[in-house]
Amino acid sequence: MSNEQPKIPQATAKRLPLYYRFLKNLHASGKQRVSSAELSEAVKVDPATIRRDFSYFGALGKKGYGYNVNYLLSFFRRTLEEDEVTEVALFGVGNLGTAFLNYNFSKNNNTKIVMAFDVDEQKVGTTVGGVPVYHLDELEERLCGNIPVAILTVPAVAAQALTDRLVTQGIKGILNFTPARLNVPKHIRVHHIDLAIELQSLVYFLRNYPLPS
């Protein structure tokens, strides 16, 4: 297989970490092979979608046999570049930010929060979950264009001004947990995660589209 990564749909790309996590669990349990139906039941993605997702990468399985767990795990580790650590900076060491620092993506081998920023003098100079907390005034000095990803858990009113500073420091991706909708250059990728909206959506679907028991 060529070392060049195939171009795949963004929806497929978002599901790859889900597949990878389940395969890691299968491998840990000693399972040698898995069918698309078993994968479907575990990750709640229909079998046809799984087979289509996998088809973008060529022949990963055999009809009637399923997929070799070790092979798939190795393949997705390379595809997701699990052996290369991406360093992340977190902004806003409140309740949510603190939770992120204590968790620090312990189930992921390829992402790690290495520094955090806040304006609260009582937090500056401390460490949370082993991660040093710096004053926001030190942003440019500390980032120096070396950190590609930022997580924002700051107040919404501060999000855009902070984003503008991050762009000048070479940030390529932002995971935005604020309600603010950020304006960024076209080469910057932003994923918005509004927990309040997600909760409202869940309640709406529970009320209006109940699942059969």
UniProtKB/Swiss-Prot annotation:
Q: Which GO terms describe its biological process?
A: negative regulation of DNA-templated transcription; response to redox state
Record's keyword annotation contains S-adenosyl-L-methionine: no
Name the GO cellular-component terms: cytoplasm
User: DNA-binding region spans which residues?
Assistant: 18-57
Which keywords appear in this protein's UniProt record, sorted alphabetically?
Answer: Cytoplasm, DNA-binding, NAD, Repressor, Transcription, Transcription regulation
Provide the residue positions that the database annotates as binding NAD(+): G92, V93, G94, N95, L96, G97
Question: Does this entry carry the keyword Transcription regulation?
Answer: yes
Q: What's this protein's function?
A: Modulates transcription in response to changes in cellular NADH/NAD(+) redox state.
Q: Which family does it belong to?
A: Belongs to the transcriptional regulatory Rex family.
The protein's name in its UniProt record? Redox-sensing transcriptional repressor Rex
Provenance organism: Geobacillus thermodenitrificans (strain NG80-2)
